[in-house]
């Protein structure tokens, strides 16, 4: 019974073997350049949020200090981006965070990551398609909405007010474009991205030309007077401003940090670059450059637009839904709103492509590995994942057609933040592993590689304890090169660190008042957590790193990945309970698929069974040869 449980546990953490000699091989068409990747990352990340988010955050959270909010959010996003960039250099294959988890922490975590990325991209595609439809309808006077509400109104809970035929057509059109070929899709994306960037440059330049620096230093007295007028009060005595204390930080630095948490989601989308590993030329160089440059461009755009917006008009007058058209009207440039509308549609188009593009590639990678249904890995004559693309498009179209996606959008955040956290943890684990544990090639025919090379991480932990390989001296004075023992120390420390981060994030979010009130239990839990955290980080720092060099490596290890994990976990804890319930339902469906199909059809399971069969056969042959030799020797020495 125990042996069966151990075998089952090992199967959950079996890792994907990557042949280092075949990293450049691909069944997909390698036709994308570094510029294509930058355009894809910028287009996906710099969506319609740049036209809306700045007004919402500036008015309600940050004021003029929204530029600092975007800077903090950009730094947090860059930490995740650098982790993706290193993995893109190490494993330039299709699959993004799913693949990175598979080669590092095992099959079950890889499936969880991939399954959540599928959810994120499906909801993202559907919601952006509906937003595109709504924006276009608003430009033409709302005729589509009026017509659909009149003839196709739906009154069922959970469903949209009316079916969005326009959004369905958009998704199906995009699916056809992606099925036709990635090269053509990249050209369309570059055109829309270029228009979007040009419009944003126009907005930024206009803002600095027509802006007034006094809008960054509004006095508290002025804000109180405005509050009095708004509330229709006769006297300003004992009246507190509704718009903060004025100045550059009207809501304090706490408001700036709150704005940064919202702005963080504006940088989500760059991870689509990591799914192009088998379709880009020179991926080990292009993927890191694409991720870093696209994040830099997006930060400059968000920083510039938010600065221009808050310079053009006082932050308390900004419109939360469409701030840019109102700002241009405020400075007397009303017709500029049509330029903004064109840019908004282009931004939505690139964002739609950025959500749709990685979805079939995640499906393709999982199906090719056998953890999802095999038919999804079928390729067209143009080397495009046509089956996965059509399945993804159909699913997203149905959701956009029927469902009210507002309640589901928060679920996107769980999938994205979980992927970010896992990739950061995987970078930590991988950098402290012995080279052979990652770089061993696939087993050639007839070669036995069962034994130490087949040990999973959990097995190495058991061996470490059994052999007594870790002492206080070895922890503080480890060898110069990574070993199984030093790798296991890092793995255990990373797991404990993540658990401590979860505890601290939960404590700060739900029991922050207890900490402020200096309650003993809260201070005790916080102090113990911080002590364990410091010990774990210290132990990780003491262990040797691999000397294997790649084209890009995350700097400031282990601090930068750990900080990235903290930011991502903290943001996940902020999500509502309803979101986590919906997430649990989605995961339950995923586990049914994995334990009912994927676990038994995985390529890694087949490879392991083949290796075991070869090893058993060799052992049998060796035993027979020994028996024959022994028998011959006995006959020769027998006195008879």
From Swiss-Prot:
Disulfide bonds: none
NCBIfam families: 2A0303
Gene Ontology terms: biological process: L-arginine import across plasma membrane; L-arginine transmembrane transport; L-ornithine transmembrane transport
A GO CC annotation given for this chain: plasma membrane
UniProt topology in membrane: Multi-pass membrane protein
Pfam families: AA_permease_2, AA_permease_C
Job of this protein: Low-affinity, high capacity permease involved in the transport of the cationic amino acids (L-arginine, L-lysine, L-ornithine and L-homoarginine).
Record's catalysed reaction(s): L-arginine(in) = L-arginine(out); L-lysine(in) = L-lysine(out); L-ornithine(in) = L-ornithine(out); L-homoarginine(in) = L-homoarginine(out)
Name recorded for this polypeptide: Cationic amino acid transporter 2
Keyword Glycoprotein set for record: yes
Gene: slc7a2
PANTHER family per record: CATIONIC AMINO ACID TRANSPORTER 2, INNER MEMBRANE TRANSPORTER YGJI-RELATED
Keywords: Amino-acid transport, Cell membrane, Glycoprotein, Membrane, Transmembrane, Transmembrane helix, Transport
Membrane-crossing segments per the record: 37-57, 65-85, 103-123, 162-182, 191-211, 248-268, 289-309, 339-359, 385-405, 409-429, 487-507, 520-540, 552-572, 580-600
Residues of the signal peptide: none
Annotated compartments: Cell membrane
Cytoplasmic side: 1-36, 86-102, 183-190, 269-288, 360-384, 430-486, 541-551, 601-640
Membrane topology, Extracellular segments: 58-64, 124-161, 212-247, 310-338, 406-408, 508-519, 573-579
